[in-house]
Curated annotation (Swiss-Prot):
It comes from Shigella flexneri. This is Autoinducer 2 import ATP-binding protein LsrA. Residues 12-240, 264-503 form the ABC transporter domain. It holds the Pfam family ABC_tran. The keyword Nucleus does not apply. Part of the ABC transporter complex LsrABCD involved in autoinducer 2 (AI-2) import. Responsible for energy coupling to the transport system. InterPro entries: AAA+_ATPase (IPR003593), ABC_carbohydrate_import_ATPase (IPR050107), ABC_transporter-like_ATP-bd (IPR003439), P-loop_NTPase (IPR027417). The keyword Cell membrane applies.
Amino acid sequence: MQTSDTRALPLLCARSVYKQYSGVNVLKGIDFTLHQGEVHALLGGNGAGKSTLMKIIAGITPADSGTLEIGGNNYARLTPVHAHQLGIYLVPQEPLLFPSLSIKENILFGLAKKQLSMQKMKNLLAALGCQFDLHSLAGSLDVADRQMVEILRGLMRDSRILILDEPTASLTPAETERLFSRLQELLATGVGIVFISHKLPEIRQIADRISVMRDGTIALSGKTSELSTDDIIQAITPAVREKSLSASQKLWLELPGNRPQHAVGTPVLTLENLTGEGFRNVSLTLNAGEILGLAGLVGAGRTELAETLYGLRTLRGGRIMLNGKEINKLSTGERLLRGLVYLPEDRQSSGLNLDASLAWNVCALTHNLRGFWAKTAKDNATLERYRRALNIKFNQPEQAARTLSGSNQQKILIAKCLEASPQALIVDEPTRGVDVSARNDIYQLLRSIAAQNVAVLFISSDMEEIELMADRVYVMHQGEITHSALTGRDINVETIMRVAFGDSQRQEASC
């Protein structure tokens, strides 16, 4: 955050930037400026144009018209290589690392020989408080650490303009604070940061200025200290209000299939002393009709536990009971057929086939149940049902999943999981990287699913989200659940954080 009002020449000045796709205006004369040593936050609803603007600045997508002034020089368009040479680096929401290469190889990949300085890399690692084993494979990192590796790649290229797309989406409050303290050190060197996020408290903490995009325009811009939260939310979307799903949406959302319906409170998924990679001796019960929160810091073992429940990782000990029957030896496909469905944390690498059509993605978990031949008309009808239920925005069923915004991709992934008719639904960071309006849609959706007596295991690093959504909460700390479930008034951010950090003094709540 800037410590002085004295400003040199802007690092970046975008003027009258226009862009359209298939005749649809995505950007309508955008003006955007970034100064040295400042954080300029960029907010906006689903499809507002944020990603398109940043891709133009990073040289990934050309603008139809307009100019970019960088370092006093004007450019009509950039390429990614030219943007890097000018000191621009985009850290994407979904880190683009090579999983089979080491952390060191990923950080240094593509650098010119003159930039291949091991000492510089070590200095950056120390400054950012990173304690990576540089020889470990990047594929072994969690999302938070992959994000840090992407930032390091930019810093190794002497970037002066960093574009951070939802950098804290999968970070805990403690990790977010650590990232922010490192960003402050970067700002002191004159680096400018474009900070894309939907988390208003974090934006108020880190940003000097805020710009809100809506429908391809800048709807609001100003100093953070001069803008109220109501102003910002109203600028994002006038219709953002807490509301239930409409009767029509609920009708379209009725779960398919003929799964037996459990009575509310019936145990659906029971874990007995589970031990696996990243966790040990975990026991809990997930009941029909409830949303059970699973909180904890990144690295606490929550994702590893979820992947083990679904059969993606090897179980080393304990029992998994689904509807009273042990499923330890069942494959992932067999668990799916019995009603256990998993929505993964990383929608792009694990959840969706980005090059496949939207209709194919929504029906991906049920294709084997429909016979050998694809049933395009039926798949399209299924997609249409979820479009109406979840307000998914797309042009045609045949378009590739990668063409959608992050929020709409997440809704497609949720639709895919629901189409499998879950009895127990595990959702890992379901609102990661989605806008304010879509986040509320997902909340209401999960409540509606639980109301149909589905048992929902809700994993999130956002403690406020856990407090808002969960009927009961378990907290993992260093791979273990050391306390009984939080209930009632104990479900609050302060208590959850204390347990997540290993505070053993909390009074135990009744299970």
